[in-house]
C-alpha cells in the first residue's frame, strides 16, 4: 500500500528548539484552518491531562461541545469535545498549538489536542455527524473508535485502511510524531465505514508501530520512511507474531529495518520466530543473547547465497 497523497511519511523526532519546523506548521495550519466557514478544535480530555478551562469559558458557561455517542454512556469528563475557534493571534488557537507541540515530547502521555477542524457545518450539526462516526460496530460488539488520537490518525490511511474517510469536516489537521502538519481525507457524503475484521487486526498493531517509532532515535540518527516499518509489521504478522507480544514485535521490526530487510529468512532467526510463535522463548530474549558473530553474519547477508541455491535461484 502506498502512502496517501499529501501525507509526509518520513520520520524524525521534533526538537524542542526546532523553531523553523514549528513556525512552518503553525503558519500553514492557520492558513488552512481559517479558510473554512467554521473552525474548531477537537479535544480528548483523557484522564490526567491538565486542561485549562479558562480558555473555553464564556461568561458562566463553556464553549465546549461534547462529542460522544449516547449509546456508550461516557461520563462527561471523559467525552471528547469541540471548541469553536476564531483567528485571533495569541488566543486559544495559538495556545492549543503550543500544547500540541509540547505533547509530542512524551509519546506515552495522553494527547489532549487531537485535531483542528474546518467545516461548513454549524457546531451542533458537526457534533451529530462526528458522534455517529465515533461509534463503530462489528457483529454484536460496539465500541468507541478513537481515530482522532494523532498516534492513531497518522497511520490510518497508509496502514489501517486506504478507504478511511471522515464526513463533516472540510479539513482535518493534526501534528504527527515528527512535528509535521498532516491531514486526513474528508468527504461531504461518505462517512467512516464499520471496519472489516482485517482493519481491526491492523489497528491492534498501532501501539507496536508507535513503540518502534519512539525507539528508533535511540538506535540510529537516520531518518526512516515509515513504509519500512509498516512492511516489517506486515511481515511480523505473516510469520505469526501477535501484537500482544509487543517486545518481540518491536525487536523484530527494528531488526528488519536496521539489520537486514529479509531477516526472517535467516536460518537462526527463523528458529527464534518459530519459538516465539509457539510461546517457547521470546524472540527478543533469543536475539539479545545472540553473539556478535551471529549479528555480523545476519547483517552481511552472505547467508542469502545458500538460501538462493536451495531455492534454485542461483545465477551467473
Ranges and model annotations:
Residues 1-58, 63-77, 87-88, 98-100, ...:
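A contiguous, surface-oriented mixed alpha/beta subdomain in the mid-to-C-terminal portion of proteins
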Amino acid at each position: 500500500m502506498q502512502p496517501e497523497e499529501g501525507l509526509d511519511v518520513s520520520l524524525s523526532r521534533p526538537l524542542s528548539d526546532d523553531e523553523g519546523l514549528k513556525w512552518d506548521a503553525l503558519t500553514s495550519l492557520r492558513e488552512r484552518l481559517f479558510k473554512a466557514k467554521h473552525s474548531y478544535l477537537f479535544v480528548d480530555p483523557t484522564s490526567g491531562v491538565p486542561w485549562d478551562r479558562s480558555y473555553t469559558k464564556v461568561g458562566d458557561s463553556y464553549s465546549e461541545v461534547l462529542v460522544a455517542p449516547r449509546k456508550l454512556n461516557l461520563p462527561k469528563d471523559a467525552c471528547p469535545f469541540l471548541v469553536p475557534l476564531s483567528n485571533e493571534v495569541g488566543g486559544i488557537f495559538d495556545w492549543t498549538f503550543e500544547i500540541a507541540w509540547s505533547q509530542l515530547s512524551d509519546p506515552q502521555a495522553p494527547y489532549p489536542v487531537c485535531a483542528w477542524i474546518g467545516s461548513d457545518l454549524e457546531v451542533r450539526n458537526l457534533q451529530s455527524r462526528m458522534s455517529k462516526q465515533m461509534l463503530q460496530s462489528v457483529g454484536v460488539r460496539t465500541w468507541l473508535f478513537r481515530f482522532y488520537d494523532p498516534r492513531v490518525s497518522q497511520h490510518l490511511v497508509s496502514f489501517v485502511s486506504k478507504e478511511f474517510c471522515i464526513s463533516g469536516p472540510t479539513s482535518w489537521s493534526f501534528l504527527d510524531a515528527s512535528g509535521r502538519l498532516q491531514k486526513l481525507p474528508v468527504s461531504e457524503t461518505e462517512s467512516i465505514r464499520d471496519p472489516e475484521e482485517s482493519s481491526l487486526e491492523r489497528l491492534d498493531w498501532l501501539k507496536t508501530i508507535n513503540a518502534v517509532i519512539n525507539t528508533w532515535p535511540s538506535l540510529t540518527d537516520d531518518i526512516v520512511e515509515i513504509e519500512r516499518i509498516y512492511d516489517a509489521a506486515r511481515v511480523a504478522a505473516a510469520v505469526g507474531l501477535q501484537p500482544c507480544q509487543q517486545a518481540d514485535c518491536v525487536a523484530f521490526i527494528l531488526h528488519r529495518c536496521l539489520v537486514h530487510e529479509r531477516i526472517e529468512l535467516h536460518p537462526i532467526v527463523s528458529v527464534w520466530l518459530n519459538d516465539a510463535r509457539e510461546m517457547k522463548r521470546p524472540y527478543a530474549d533469543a536475539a539479545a543473547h545472540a553473539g556478535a558473530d551471529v549479528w555480523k553474519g545476519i547483517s552481511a547477508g552472505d547467508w542469502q547465497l545458500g538460501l538462493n541455491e536451495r531455492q534454485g535461484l542461483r545465477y551467473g
